[in-house]
Amino acid sequence: MRTVLPIMLVLLLASCSSVRVNYDYDKTIDFSGYTTYNYYPDMKSGLSQLDERRLLRALDSTLKSRGYRLAEEPELFVNIISDEYRGAPNNNVGVGIGGTGRNVGGGISVGLPLGGSNWKRSIQFDLVDAQRDALIWQATSESGLRDNASPSVREEQLREVVKKVFSKFPPKVK
């Protein structure tokens, strides 16, 4: 029992900070032909300036590690769109009382929501072929958001989003 409690606590904390990602891409594209990228000049990410800089630093680092380089005349344009919204509370506690007599039964149950609704952030990453002006790859992430998080925590959260989103980029050709 002593080892089960710490393991359960770690799993609970890990599940709270998970990043979910959905992908879509053009199966006819050979992604190995792309080597350069840049951001849309008029990109409106929806993030604060500080968070946008954190996200772009993480993205630059990830793309560089995969052999892509930032260029004035890129082959790919990156567009980022973000949205923050309040999610529904998903934790409830049921409290019930009941009694039974010889031939009489009864009960009462009440559901109590725990905590308030939680904030979520969705970030959509679009990769557009610059020459054809065509969307070729898209990923949308969803993760928890804490407004009162420290700058280092915010940076780590955004790094984790980029890591998870680009873990399957470029797509494997079958």
Task: Go through each PLM region and give its residues.
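Positively charged n-region of N-terminal signal peptides that target proteins for export
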Residues: 1-5
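C-terminal motif of bacterial Sec signal peptides marking the signal peptidase cleavage site
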Residues: 12-15
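C-terminal/domain-edge helix-coil "capping" segments
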Residues: 17-28, 115-174
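A generic local structural motif
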Residues: 24-26, 63-65, 111
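Immediate post-signal peptide segment of exported/extracytoplasmic ligand-binding proteins
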Residues: 30-36
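N-terminal segment of the mature soluble domain
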Residues: 36-87
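Surface-exposed short loop/turn segments
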Residues: 66, 80-134, 142
